[in-house]
Amino acid sequence: MFKVSKSARPIDWTTKDYKDPLVVRQLKKDFHGKCYICEQKHFPNLNVEHFIPHLDDETLKLDWNNLYYACSRCNSIKNKYYDDLLDCCNEDHLVEEWIKVYYRMPDEDIEVINGCPNDHSYHPKAETSKELIIKCFNNANSGIQEVSKEDLRDKIIDVHSEFLDLRRE
C-alpha cells in the first residue's frame, strides 16, 4: 500500500456509471497507474474497486471517495470480504510506515509485516490489511490465481533485478 492524495470528484462526471472513462482516467492519475493493494503498474485488467463494498447500495457504489484503482487480481481477492482496512487516502492511516512487504526468494511467499503499534486504534485495520495483501501476493487457489500469481511474481523479480543492476552501476 502507498499513500494517495485523491483529487476531488470530477466535475464533468454526470453519469451514474463508476466505470465512466472520465472516472477511470482520473483514478489512474490519482493512484499513479498502480493498484492500491499490490502496487503493480501496467496490469492487464483494471477494476474500479469499491473500498467499502457497496453491496448494491447506490450511494456507496457512486461515492467518489469510495472508488479506488485496482488490478483484477486484488479486486477479486478483496471482493466484499474486506471492509476494515487501512485507507491509503486517509492521511491518518500511515500505510507506508505500518505495512511492510518483503520479497525474500523467488519461490517463497511474499511476507507482509504489520508495523502499527499493538495499542494503536488502527492496529486491527492494519492487521486486516496485512492479511489481504498476503492473499493478494500469495493466493493460488484456482488456475487463474495461480497464473496471475506467477505473473505478479515475475514482475517483482524483474523490478528487483533492475534495482540490483542500478546498485552495481
What are these regions (language model features)?
Residues 9, 35, 56-59, 107:
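Residues in flexible loops and secondary-structure boundaries
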Residues 16, 37-70, 78-93, 97-99:
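Histidine-centered nuclease catalytic patch
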